[in-house]
Amino acid sequence: MPQLFLLRRKKSPFFTPAAPIILYMKIMSFSPFGYEGALVTVEVDLRRGIPAVDMVGLADNAVRESRERMRAAIRNSGFEFPVERVLISLSPADVKKEGAGFDLAIALAVLHKNEHPEYGSAKDAALIMGELELSGRIRAVRGVHAALSTAREYGIRKCIIPAENAAEADAFAAMNVFPVRFLTDAFELFSTLAAESEQKNADGGTDCTLGEASDVGINAGVRNRAAEFLAARSDAHASIKDEPVVFSDFPAQLDYREISGQGFFIEALQIAAAGRHNLIAYGPPGCGKTLALSRFYTLLPRLTREEALTVTRIYSISGLLTSGTRILQDPPFRMPHQSSTAEGIIGGGIHCRPGEISLAHNGVLFLDEAADFRISVLQALRVPLEEVKITLSRAGRSTDYPARFQLLLAANPCPCGNFGSTDKICLCRPQAVEQYWRRFSAPLLDRIDIRVALIGSGEATKTQQDGAHCFFSDKQRLSTAQLRQAIADATAIQRKRQGKPNALLNAAEIRQFCPLGEEAERFLTNSARRFAFSARGIHSCIKLARTCADTEKGTHIQKHHMEKAVLLHRNAGGIHMMF
């Protein structure tokens, strides 16, 4: 056996290995799948045979169709398409390649291979994304923000993307991201980047800039546009500040001062916004549920930079970023229709797209007329509310989407809407009312911190004098600006104290950040025994009391804070029969 091995290792007189020639720029692209996606290496080989384009690497139909788009775009851009047989390899081979974002990467790989057929392995890499029109114009693609984030994690600093996606690069000031509109510009840029990489390696690792590669012959206009974009992007990045609490401006007609007769509900919304607590409001039609909840987003401060980047990535993956959108700084507010399916709310599908709960990440998911949603949809909310993420699986692959959303529910008290009203007659049978509320399971309702039972506008003035509403009687006509001030104070306190909203505190953090005074603890114990609160319900009351104290800039949880918290959790309204 050793002699046989030595014979096999002898050099053949008919084969002389060529000296390896290094290609200094590897072409990478991105396959969007779920929240993570995957980087894909694009390689091209030219060989003898009947002229054709072959593609390997588990590509879907959209990627395979890029062969014809790429061929037409190359010819219509003034380049010569190779006369040899073209083999395109997309690796890793076991990852399914999806989407039209590979067009530009494949075209540049073919053109570069046609110009330098002897090149082999590569040291440096560039991320390239874009869909090609037959004219050679480059169209926008989804997932550019996620692609740039993944490329940064793998140390790739050079990227070529469609000009329409240029705004998504603002979050990546440390990377050299070049937006292009036409295939000709992309080829000149890529040739320059490859020459820079070669010069860098020849100089022993010294980095060079775009302007130093003057011997490549790149079009001066392309170089200037790229330099201007990088400078503008750096300035835009420098102007984005992670301020403690900042609010956006909204039209005056969305002011909460316009809502009268529901003072207790307005303060409940203030506390919900300050601590990011889940809330359900139920009452007869026309009492102001939808009116108040639909403008809830005006009470929320802007996202922190870390939160904004995560939200922007999700919307980029979904293809929902409009042209020119840089970083989404306002919390998302999603209001899906009652006909939405579980897949639309939770996410999924062939490509594992994010659902409404992920699109509402770091924001609000508002389900108006919640009882009209499918039971499967309502029950599917339980796990993401607890785990603040959702795991989606498809064809042997899985992905985790963040889903830290604030849930707002609005519902009628019964099918006809008049249950509990003093001036209207409910026509529903007791069995119908019971069946109606069975749609909201106990585990789901237990995850909702604030429960508000509303009354009709005609009864509001009279009921405001009730002792049960003594906490809320002076909040009836506060403006949005006044409500924001207390929310800003509470938000700043929470960020400084624990780095997260009170609603997201776990059991250990509750013990650490929410110590109770003797009177507050005694009142909570008696209330929990009287109203049969679950362990989660007790934690909800403590977190609500912590938020009530924060809105008053209080350092300790007092008894009146706990009284208000129990009232909000028990039902702050005129109907006390639903839970």
Can you describe what each PLM-predicted range is?
Residues A62-R67, P82, S89-G99, H351-C352, ...:
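Basic, amphipathic alpha-helical bundle interface domains used for macromolecular binding and assembly
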Residues A281-L320:
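Walker A/P-loop
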Residues P17-L279, C287, H556-F579:
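Peripheral, non-AAA+ core regions of ATP-driven protein-machinery
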Residues K10-S12, K200-N201:
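Polybasic, lysine-rich low-complexity intrinsically disordered segments
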